Amino acid sequence: GRLAVVPIGYWSARFAEGARCTIFTERGSYRGTILPLMASGHTYGDDVDEQPTGWPYVEIRVDARCSTAEEAIRLGIDVGDVVSIDPQPEFLDNGFISSRHLDDKAGVAVMFAALKALIAVKDQLPVDAYFLFTIEEEVGIGAANILTEDIASLIAVDNGTTAPGQNSAEFGVTLAMADHNGPFDYHLTRKLARLCREDDIYYQKDIFRHYRSDVASAVVAGHDVRTALVCFGIDASHGWERIHIHALRSLAELVTAYLLSPIAFWRDAEEVGTLEDFTSQPTEKAEQKLSSDVRMDEIPDEAVEE
């Protein structure tokens, strides 16, 4: 009568243990709990702590009369029924939000906040903008099949990862410079950084080595678009996640500022362009006060590069 489960996308079974859930069947929904195979200390003793972690070692206890496979079938439970996990959100007075599924429901909230701000200011956007909400990013499809030919730039709103070795933060905007598939568009990302500075939006940059965003799936699918990834920092992503409202507000401000900003790449409107006005990276040398004949005790602070 217990149900085996498999994840959709990547999610560690470590964070599934103890989760309350809903099983959706063709005859209606049932409630249940995801438990390790050995869940009772009174029955299994120390073996409870010594059992492995992984999806083969957890099961769903259905809150119904369901002690055998036959009883589960009579309830209408079948192979392939979808299971949803309770998010159990908590909003703290100090601005922190703890919950499951902040990746990427928090991104949806950011986009709706930007939409609300655009409606409030009633300014005409310099170019058409589409707000796209994907539901298949976790399985690698993402934005592969939702872009039209007239889209020139694609900015994904997703989570950054606050962890040792990363530069993301739960405050301000995190601008992703690259993910698992490679770097994002230099000029589009540079424009986003400039907007942050002009509008006093706190930001930092980061690179994600084990991360694949919607923009990656769009490029792999063959869409000729500039790409960027803007993030809110999440602690313990895909686990018991936590963010701060400061990051969400900052990100909504950046999205709004970007949509209201002048078009930077008019040549992108042409299907095929010339080398005239082709975007290029700066090649001039950075100015330094350090010279080859300076003594060590005379090294100026401006010459120290961070």
Locations of the language-model features?
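N-terminal hydrophobic/helix-forming segments and targeting peptides
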Residues: 1-306
